[in-house]
């Protein structure tokens, strides 16, 4: 059975990724130079969101049964022993943190774009960009809050879930996904629209950054070229990651939801593909941020503090 295999996968995945996330969190807090003040805050928020979403997904081990009407959410993880409202609330919060993490990746790329092009905007303009970027999160969470209060929090719904789950063994039903009301349609359209538009914007920013870097290539030092190469490679990975991890499973979910076709890989692996960025993102951050990369190499005995000071000096230019 897939859920038995995945129960071991989730544990192994957690044991591998959680220490890496903690290491990244430590490096961000204690080894971020002062000139990375803005990026430090973004990295901290993103790392915290990814840690929370990873722990929640491992505890949930959710399955989205898309061929049923309405779509049922099944929980195979330890949270199945708690009330359905608790597991569903954690599912909604996880949905929000995954969306938040994706938005923060975009904001990170936008900040790098402004840094590369030496664009200095007023604080109000930066605030407007951040609010606009976070608007999908605000819309989704507002609609999800309404759905939770209206369709999951009332006593009669909790009693209904308790009656259903009393006869189940290896899983519990924690909630439903139905598109028969406006808030649910808003959530569906916002999330699907975001994960379609998000990679396109990322590729546009990546292209503009590469064009600008290439135009200044003759004036760059060897060290700066190496840092630019790492930056471009990191931007490429961040742009392609949602395209290959999230978009295919969302397309399968959309097809299954419309046609009511039973696609087991889609049902079980929705949570798995949402976990994948938590594996890749720490390594991308270590690789693209030269100060973090050098710090790790110092710990491994492959660099000395002199090279670290050189990186700090060059990165300020």
UniProtKB/Swiss-Prot annotation:
Keywords: Membrane, Transmembrane, Transmembrane helix. Gene3D superfamilies: Rhodopsin 7-helix transmembrane proteins. GO terms for cellular component: membrane. The keyword Transmembrane applies. It holds the Pfam family 7TM_GPCR_Srd. It is a multi-pass membrane protein. It is found in: Membrane. Signal peptide: none annotated. It comes from the Eukaryota. The keyword Lyase does not apply. The chain crosses the membrane at residues 9-29, 42-62, 91-111, 129-149, 185-205, 239-259, 269-289. Its main location: membrane. Belongs to the nematode receptor-like protein srd family. This is Serpentine receptor class delta-46. It comes from Caenorhabditis elegans. The lineage of its organism: Eukaryota, Metazoa, Ecdysozoa, Nematoda, Chromadorea.
């Amino acid at each position: 059975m897939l859920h038995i295999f995945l129960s071991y996968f989730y544990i192994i995945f957690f044991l591998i990724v959680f220490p890496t996330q903690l290491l990244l969190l430590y490096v961000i807090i204690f080894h971020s130079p002062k000139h990375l003040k803005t990026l430090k805050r973004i990295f901290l928020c993103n790392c915290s969101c990814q840690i929370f979403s990873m722990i929640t997904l491992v505890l949930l081990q959710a399955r989205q049964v898309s061929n049923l009407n309405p779509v049922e959410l099944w929980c195979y993880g330890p949270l199945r022993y708690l009330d359905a409202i608790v597991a569903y609330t954690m599912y909604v919060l996880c949905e929000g943190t995954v969306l938040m993490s994706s938005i923060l990746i975009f904001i990170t790329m936008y900040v790098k774009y402004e840094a590369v092009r030496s664009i200095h905007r007023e604080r109000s303009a930066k605030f407007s960009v951040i609010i606009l970027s976070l608007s999908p999160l605000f819309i989704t969470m507002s609609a999800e809050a309404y759905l939770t209060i209206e369709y999951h929090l009332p006593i009669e719904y909790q009693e209904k879930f308790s009656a259903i789950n009393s006869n189940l063994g290896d899983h519990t039903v924690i909630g439903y996904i139905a598109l028969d009301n406006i808030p649910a349609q808003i959530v569906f359209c916002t999330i699907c629209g975001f994960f379609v538009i998000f990679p396109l914007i990322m590729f546009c920013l990546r292209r503009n950054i590469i064009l600008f870097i290439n135009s200044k290539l003759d004036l760059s030092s060897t060290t700066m070229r190496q840092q630019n190469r790492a930056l471009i490679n990191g931007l490429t990975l961040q742009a392609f990651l949602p395209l290959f991890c999230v978009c295919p499973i969302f397309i399968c979910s959309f097809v299954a939801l419309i046609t009511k076709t039973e696609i087991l890989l889609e049902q079980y692996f929705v949570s798995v593909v949402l976990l994948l960025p938590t594996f890749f993102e720490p390594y991308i951050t270590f690789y693209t941020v030269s100060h973090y990369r050098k710090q790790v190499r110092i710990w491994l005995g492959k660099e000395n503090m002199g090279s670290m000071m050189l990186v700090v000096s060059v990165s300020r230019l």
